[in-house]
Amino acid sequence: MAVGKNKRLTKGKKGVKKKIVDPFTKKDWYDVKAPSMFNIRQIGKTVVTRTAGTKIASDGLKGRVFEVSLADLQNDEIAFRKFKLMCEEVQGRNCLTNFHGMNMTTDKLRSLVKKWQTLIEAAVDVKTTDGYLLRMFCIGFTKRRQNQIKKTAYAKHTQIKAIRKKMVDIITREVSTNDLKEVVNKLIPDSIGKDIEKSCQSIYPLHDVHIRKVKVLKKPKFDIGKLMEMHGEASSHATTTTTDETGTKIDREGFEPPIQDTV
């Protein structure tokens, strides 16, 4: 056998352990900040590989979407609505997010659908005053009239069309006359759904009317000033709001406080 052809002699030792490197030693943690419309500003942390060479850490964070329950954002028990927040800017160790969509949990939607009633849905594309194109989906259900003996509460086709038209008109009116911040303020207590429910009573009584889904189809050109304004940091008291973990409590249209037993 020729010299140098024996591969067994040139092979290294079997079972040599590789040095295990913890991947988290090359990563940094960033705080995720929600806009000032929500009561809880600090919604969590996210991890990213730290800046090395041409790969910048902030570029890996921009565009990340975080899905958070409204219960965590408002510190209450309404947990069936989920808000999507997208990271648009990184300042220091803070990821500043903006509204990117809303959805209802599957279990809540399934629990609404019942027998002996009519399900009515509507969808509409509408533009806000600051240039966001939103696709909004609404859902509602008929209910029995007061003192009704009949078990079923089925609406006629003409009534369904009239209710759907009313849904589209109210959503268009509420969104097209407001900016994104005001629209989110209406989505938090679901005041648009309550308005639709009241307006449709003359056509057919409704219940469980909700904006079940919101998609952001188009966004205007990114403006850092607008984003800072959403986070309450554009005004003169910027130093106080950056460290504040809670948003500002505001009176919202369509919100009714619970009845108190004692004064």
UniProtKB/Swiss-Prot annotation:
Keywords: Cytoplasm, Ribonucleoprotein, Ribosomal protein. It holds the Pfam family Ribosomal_S3Ae. Residues 235-245 have a biased composition (Low complexity). It is found in: Cytoplasm. One of its GO terms (biological process) is translation. It comes from the Eukaryota. GO terms for cellular component: cytosol; cytosolic small ribosomal subunit. GO terms for molecular function: structural constituent of ribosome. Residues 233-263 are annotated as: Disordered. Coiled coil: none annotated. Residues 246-255 have a biased composition (Basic and acidic residues). HAMAP family: Ribosomal_eS1_euk. Belongs to the eukaryotic ribosomal protein eS1 family. Component of the small ribosomal subunit. Mature ribosomes consist of a small (40S) and a large (60S) subunit. The 40S subunit contains about 33 different proteins and 1 molecule of RNA (18S). The 60S subunit contains about 49 different proteins and 3 molecules of RNA (28S, 5.8S and 5S). This is Small ribosomal subunit protein eS1. It comes from Nematostella vectensis.
